């Protein structure tokens, strides 16, 4: 039998402070029971005439009364249809194909509606590209049912009608055009062919208007590099399913890199598939990065490295691939060996290899493109390009300077929030008030909208018509799934109206598709039904001769004096557009397992040198010191999270938090990292000093500890998988039979009667841990499907989170190097041995990571069923574990007896409860239930 020598641990504290964690494991209740207050009046208790028999009688009656009362069903009053719509059958869901793009996230999706209400997002399997929804796309449905939405047009702080609003705006625009005063139309990236035509018509009428696209988190380095090398400003498209060797240098492609939707393609290559030689093959993934990312957590080999060293490493790699005879600063012996190994693998895999790079530097992107071209990588598409990022930071800076110098007289904005996302937002805010026209087309009264003279209430994408082209040749349609909830209007409709075009947007959209997109054999109705449509539109690059030696010189000319700050976006919060979404606020980060916060990630070594600590008060209550991060005149105070795998000398902060307007008070969490986003660069040279305050995190990484589990995760290498019998890496469970450990089948040891499985269906759900990347989309989907309540940060700290599905994240390291003879024998040279021994000495430096989704297993003989005193939980004939809520009296015996620790209890009534002011306490928010 194979013995797994790895040690699995959930946090740095669990690894280093076993006594504290052991005490927390046995602490069933976070709050102590108020025994002292119960026994406070001892005299009255002593003088009581109630005897033991009477006490038990009262107790028995109260328990019986509770059980009887619990059997009363709730009464819900409903209002029926006056006239039943023909196509709507009560209880039967309808699905509509549509698409979503908010300037940051995009997806081709299906929307589940019930009685005319959109209630859930699903993937559109007909889509060739971007056919899956991430956590934020799943949660976006709740953003429609947000009572904080603007409900009509506003002029100078007063509600007015659309007719009066249009009249005022047209008069302003005509006056500015007549006087030839410049106006800026500032939007997020536009990927809609129809919207692009409408904007073109609008700027043709008003020639003084300049359209500028602005991405809150810029990808200009990638776009500029592609334009320099291939003649078009776009993002390369990567097919991870066809890559057998993936080298990523700083690219979190399973996170938010380039608006990524690569999870599905990546997962296809990670599932071992047998070939003709009967061996299974899967892609090999090497990740070089500074922050511990979701992509790094999924890599076969992860190499922590500072950005400055990443640039030098990339330059050396290009030198070897291109066979250049140039002089470069040297690498240390460890990284020299890594370089040689990676180079040899890259060349041996050749066209099956792929290099992706997340370094925010145009020269790094140029070298990356060139390496892929030199190895003839087939995973980097030669015909497809991604169009979901177009923002040009140079043009945005030019506009900002013109606004500052009073060279701009008006601004119209849509899909952007520069007062929040610009590092120099105070300057922009001061200039905004001086403009003759300041207009924002927005759904929320956010930081920018609240400072504008005119506000056009925008519709949600689920209330809108539109189209998108995320990838060249791949079109998708956005159609409304519900009538507008408020007196709102789309951006396109506003521009049509102000251009003097009264044609309905639907007709403009349909005419554009019939004239310019659809072929004669494909109908408009079919396109709406499918939601997607493909045409042959291959990208033809225009190759340009480039002096790559100049890029190498500029790339390596980079030095950092203090800490290297790496700004990034979380899978949950993104760029902060959905900060008022409670599902996303309570969503635990896949790596840190922290919800309701952002923080400064730092390595254990650096934290100790500065004097920063983390410590647990309970299984959900992680406390930490604050730190002051300084960059020039800007300072940001954040709590510190000691992150295993963080590169020494680097720190990380996520965007998307620190919102101050347009969100409920409960959602005003974290700090605004955009303050440190100088020159639209994700890497900054910062100074850090400790602060005396203590911060309280809601961190679920020690929740639901599985007791008595040795090998928490069954895993092995591909080589062992191919060469050994499955019982070697997945041993058969044994029991003691006649004092001998014997492998027996289930029937021999089962103490319960078997269920009859010969009738009806028997449901089963399997999760392929090779394919799971830990992205958490399923967690939000489960929230939506099962109406799971949001409990808030305070309750999460008490281990009272209500997620029915959780994704456990385990770090792993070897327990004892002396026991691992095979590893010792495979050591190659002094450098390798030092590296291996260092890993054994401090697993925190670079642990391996594994994700494990856990939900109700619907056990055949479920332990929760046998201990319930009132039979509230029972077993169905189709194998499911059933729950009768109105029978439950809350003993929580089932939670105590669940080996997977997936039982959830509502400690309060969250519906219509002002203490939990989230979507269930909101008349509009409850529409998603």
Model-predicted regions and their roles:
Residues 2-334, 339-340, 594-598, 605-609, ...:
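N-terminal export/assembly segments and adjacent metallocofactor-ligating motifs
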Residues 184-186, 246-250, 354-356, 409-415, ...:
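Structural motif
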Residues 210-229, 290-294, 376-405:
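Short connector loops at secondary-structure junctions
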Residues 256-277, 423-438, 474-477:
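A short, gly/pro- and small-residue-rich
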Residues 301-403, 516:
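Active-site phosphate/pyrophosphate-binding segments
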Residues 444-478, 802, 906-928:
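Flexible glycine/proline-rich, aromatic-decorated loop/lid segments
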Residues 484-540, 794:
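N-terminal leader/propeptide and maturation segments of large enzyme subunits in energy/redox metabolism
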Residues 515-592:
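Long, low-complexity segments enriched in small/aliphatic residues
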């Amino acid at each position: 039998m194979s013995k797994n020598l790895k040690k699995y641990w959930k946090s740095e504290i669990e690894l280093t402070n076993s006594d504290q964690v052991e005490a927390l494991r046995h602490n069933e209740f976070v709050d102590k029971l108020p025994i002292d207050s119960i026994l406070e009046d001892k005299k009255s208790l002593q003088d009581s005439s109630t005897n033991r028999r009477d006490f038990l009688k009262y107790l028995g009656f109260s328990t019986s009364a509770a059980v009887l009362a619990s059997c009363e069903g709730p009464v819900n009053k409903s209002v029926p249809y006056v006239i039943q719509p023909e196509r709507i059958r009560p209880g039967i869901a309808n699905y509509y194909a549509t698409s979503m793009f908010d300037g940051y996230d995009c997806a081709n999706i299906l929307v589940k509606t019930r009685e005319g209400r959109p209630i859930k997002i699903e993937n559109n399997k007909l889509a060739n590209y971007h056919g899956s929804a991430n956590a934020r796309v799943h949660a976006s449905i709740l953003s429609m049912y947000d009572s904080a939405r603007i409900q009509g047009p506003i002029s100078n702080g007063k509600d007015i009608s659309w007719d009066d609003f249009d009249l005022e705006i047209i008069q302003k625009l005509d006056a500015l055009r007549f006087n030839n005063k410049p106006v800026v139309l500032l939007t997020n990236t536009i990927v809609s062919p129809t919207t692009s035509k409408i904007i073109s018509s609008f700027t043709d009428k008003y020639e003084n208007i300049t359209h500028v696209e602005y991405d809150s988190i810029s990808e200009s380095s990638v776009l500029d590099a592609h334009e320099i090398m291939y003649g078009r400003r776009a993002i390369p498209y990567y097919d991870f399913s066809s890559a057998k060797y993936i080298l990523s240098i700083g690219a979190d492609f399973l996170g938010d890199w380039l608006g990524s939707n690569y999870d599905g393609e990546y997962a296809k290559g990670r599932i071992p598939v047998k070939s003709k030689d009967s061996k299974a093959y899967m892609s090999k993934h090497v990740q070089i990065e500074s922050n511990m990312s979701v992509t790094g957590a999924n890599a076969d080999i992860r190499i922590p490295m500072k950005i400055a060293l990443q640039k030098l490493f990339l330059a050396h790699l290009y030198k070897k691939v291109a066979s250049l005879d140039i002089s470069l600063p040297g690498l240390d012996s460890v990284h020299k060996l890594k370089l040689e190994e990676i180079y040899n693998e890259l060349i041996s895999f050749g066209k099956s290899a792929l290099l992706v790079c997340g370094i925010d530097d145009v020269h790094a992107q140029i070298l990356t493109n060139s390496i892929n071209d030199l190895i003839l990588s087939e995973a980097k598409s030669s015909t497809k390009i991604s169009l979901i990022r177009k923002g040009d930071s140079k043009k945005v800076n030019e506009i900002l300077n013109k606004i500052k110098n009073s060279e701009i007289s008006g601004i119209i904005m849509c899909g952007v929030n520069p007062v929040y996302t610009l590092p120099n937002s105070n300057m922009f805010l001061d200039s905004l008030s001086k403009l003759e026209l300041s207009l924002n087309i927005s759904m929320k009264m956010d930081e920018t909208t609240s400072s504008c003279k005119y506000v056009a209430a925008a519709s949600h994408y689920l209330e809108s018509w539109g189209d998108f082209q995320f990838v060249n040749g791949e079109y998708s349609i956005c159609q409304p799934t519900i009538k507008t909830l408020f007196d709102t209007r789309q951006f396109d409709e506003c521009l049509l109206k102000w251009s003097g075009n009264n044609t309905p947007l639907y007709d403009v959209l349909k005419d554009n598709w019939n004239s310019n997109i659809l072929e004669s054999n494909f109908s408009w109705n079919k396109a709406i039904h499918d939601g997607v449509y493909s045409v042959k539109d291959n990208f033809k690059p225009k190759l340009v001769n480039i002096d790559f030696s100049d890029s190498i010189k500029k790339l390596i000319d980079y030095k950092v004096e203090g800490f290297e700050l790496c700004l990034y976006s979380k899978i949950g919060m993104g760029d902060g557009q959905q900060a008022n979404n409670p599902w996303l606020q309570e969503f635990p980060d896949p790596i840190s397992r922290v919800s309701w916060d952002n923080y400064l990630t730092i390595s254990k070594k650096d934290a100790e040198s500065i004097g920063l600590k983390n410590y647990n008060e309970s299984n959900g209550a992680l406390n930490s010191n604050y730190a002051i991060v300084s960059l020039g005149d800007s300072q940001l105070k954040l709590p510190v999270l000691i992150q295993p795998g963080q590169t020494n000398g680097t720190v990380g902060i996520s965007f998307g938090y620190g919102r101050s307007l347009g969100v409920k008070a409960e959602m005003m969490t974290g700090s605004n990292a955009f303050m440190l986003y100088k020159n639209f660069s994700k890497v900054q040279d910062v100074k850090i000093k400790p602060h005396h305050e203590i911060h309280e995190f809601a961190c679920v990484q020690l929740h639901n500890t599985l007791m008595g589990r040795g090998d928490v995760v069954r895993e092995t290498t591909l080589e062992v998988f191919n060469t050994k019998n499955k019982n070697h890496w997945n041993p058969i469970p044994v029991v003691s039979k006649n004092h001998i450990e014997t492998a027996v089948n289930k029937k021999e040891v089962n103490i319960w009667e078997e269920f009859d499985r010969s009738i009806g269906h028997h449901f089963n759900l399997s999760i392929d841990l090779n394919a799971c990347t830990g992205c958490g989309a399923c967690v939000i989907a489960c929230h939506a499907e099962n109406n799971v309540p949001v409990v808030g940060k305070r309750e999460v700290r008490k281990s009272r989170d209500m997620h029915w599905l959780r994704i456990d994240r385990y770090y792993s390291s070897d327990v004892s190097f002396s026991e691992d003879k095979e590893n010792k024998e495979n050591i190659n040279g002094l450098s390798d041995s030092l590296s291996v021994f260092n890993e054994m000495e401090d697993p925190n430096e670079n642990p391996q990571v594994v994700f494990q989704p856990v939900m109700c297993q619907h056990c055949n003989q479920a332990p929760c069923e046998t201990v319930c005193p009132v039979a509230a939980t029972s077993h169905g004939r189709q194998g499911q574990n059933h729950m009768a809520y109105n029978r439950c009296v809350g003993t929580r015996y089932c939670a105590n007896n669940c080996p997977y620790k997936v039982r959830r209890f509502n400690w309060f009534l969250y519906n219509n409860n002002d203490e939990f002011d989230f979507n269930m306490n909101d008349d509009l928010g409850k529409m998603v239930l």
